[in-house]
């Protein structure tokens, strides 16, 4: 069959390679000047291609269980075997995140390009699809310059995340033109903008912390890990984990940060009491030196309502309790999440109920398939979205007809 894959990202490359290996004539269309451009930016340029801790709880959407058949078709182990078979060496970190041993995202893109070429895929970069029509013979793919016929079409256009790297609404619009519907779309795995009264002075400071995103003190989401403070709010892996909830939850939200999760409030009080007893000549500016980053320690003191020039000997047990409490609950009112340009993934997408999970073929338009971020599935930070791309691209590329 003559197969056209629209979108040369992770899922599109996998779908094209799989379909070509199945004996089909495959053309891969990519709007950008080269395939895999967004892949080059993943994992801070290292490409976190999957995670050893894989499972349904790491995925979201109106029906997250939709992923199961794809993950049965191409499991975590099978994914690693696939990449190892292409000659890519990988390494796993303690948190389960898997990276190319080279620490270069370009290595992943290269082996996929080589595999596509070896399988006989015709890749056309710089080809912007403007329309998709169903015909009696199959499909017609439209651009400003030409039309291409296809027996089968796999839409792998990605989502709106990373607009500067090519994220657009094009995939949604193509599928909507054929009768499909899209959920509300939100940026996810993105920085959170907060009240910056205290964070502005912390730009660039990192901390390992426990985070709770709360509405009226009730947690709607929680995470643990690295937080990076910015001039507008917070970033980092632990923040990305909360960003989906921050984008979708209604009502005023507050981010509560425990800056010393390994210590209880009484333990922090005792630590400060010992410092006060042994070094009464210190000023409050240095009370938390060696406990927190210097700028963070000073900010916690200001947050708790204390100046930086008072002698620590003037602090009462109640003062120490208040300062310890501030370190355990550094609360920042949430303003918003940053937009799609800074997001790593789109939450929401084409409704999965309109596709057969066992084949990823459209229930509305026979011969039409979709995979990856364009569908209403998104994963947590840590390689989960790329695993969905690999598995869904593989299943779609099998071009199963279903029952």
State where each predicted segment sits:
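Short hydrophobic core segments
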Residues: 4-6, 29, 129, 148-164, ...
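A glycine-rich dinucleotide-binding beta-alpha-beta segment and adjacent secondary-structure elements
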Residues: 125, 298-378
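Beta1/beta-strand and adjacent pyrophosphate-binding region of the FAD-binding site
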Residues: 1-11
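Glycine-rich FAD pyrophosphate-binding loop
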Residues: 4, 20-44
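A conserved short coil-to-beta-strand element within the FAD-binding core of flavoproteins
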Residues: 125-138
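Glycine-rich active-site loop/strand segments that organize a redox cofactor
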Residues: 46-92
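Glycine-rich loop(s) and the adjacent beta-strand/alpha-helix scaffold that form part
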Residues: 152-198
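An anion/pyrophosphate-binding glycine-rich loop and adjacent beta-alpha core
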Residues: 33-35, 40-41, 49-56, 89, ...
């Amino acid at each position: 069959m003559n197969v056209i894959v629209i979108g040369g990202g992770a899922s599109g490359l996998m779908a094209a390679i799989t379909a070509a290996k199945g004996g089909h004539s495959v053309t891969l269309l990519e709007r950008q000047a080269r395939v895999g451009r967004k892949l080059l930016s993943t994992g801070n340029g290292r490409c976190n291609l999957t995670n050893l801790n894989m499972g349904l709880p790491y995925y979201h959407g109106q029906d997250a269980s939709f992923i199961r058949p794809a993950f049965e078709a191409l499991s975590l182990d099978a994914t690693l075997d696939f990449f190892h078979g292409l000659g890519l060496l990988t390494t796993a970190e303690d948190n389960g995140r898997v990276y190319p041993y080279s620490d270069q995202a370009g290595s992943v893109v290269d082996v996929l390009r080589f595999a596509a070429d070896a399988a006989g895929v015709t890749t056309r970069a710089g080809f912007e699809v403007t329309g998709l029509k169903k015909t009696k013979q199959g499909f017609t793919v439209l651009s400003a310059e030409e039309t291409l016929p296809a027996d089968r079409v796999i839409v792998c256009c990605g989502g709106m995340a990373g607009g500067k790297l090519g994220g657009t609404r094009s995939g949604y619009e193509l599928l909507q033109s054929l009768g499909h519907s899209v959920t509300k779309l939100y940026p996810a795995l993105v920085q959170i903008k907060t009240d910056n009264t205290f964070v502005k002075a912390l730009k660039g400071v990192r901390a390992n912390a426990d985070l709770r995103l709360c509405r009226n003190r009730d947690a709607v989401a929680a995470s643990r890990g690295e937080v990076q403070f910015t001039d507008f709010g917070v970033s980092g892996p632990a923040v990305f984990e909360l960003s989906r909830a921050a984008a979708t939850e209604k009502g005023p939200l507050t981010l509560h940060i425990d800056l010393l999760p390994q210590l209880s409030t009484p333990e922090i009080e005792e630590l400060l009491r010992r410092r006060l007893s042994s070094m009464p000549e210190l000023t409050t500016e240095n009370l938390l030196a060696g406990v927190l980053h210097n700028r963070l320690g000073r900010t916690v003191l200001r947050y708790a309502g204390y100046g930086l020039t008072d002698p620590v000997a003037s602090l009462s047990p109640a003062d120490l309790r208040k300062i310890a409490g501030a370190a355990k609950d550094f609360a920042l009112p949430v303003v918003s999440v940053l937009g799609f340009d800074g997001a790593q993934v789109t939450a929401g997408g084409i409704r999965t109920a309109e596709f057969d999970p066992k084949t990823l073929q459209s229930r509305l338009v026979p011969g039409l398939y979709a995979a990856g971020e364009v569908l209403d599935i998104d994963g947590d930070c840590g390689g989960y979205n790329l695993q969905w791309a690999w598995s869904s691209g593989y299943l779609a590329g099998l071009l199963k007809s279903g029952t």
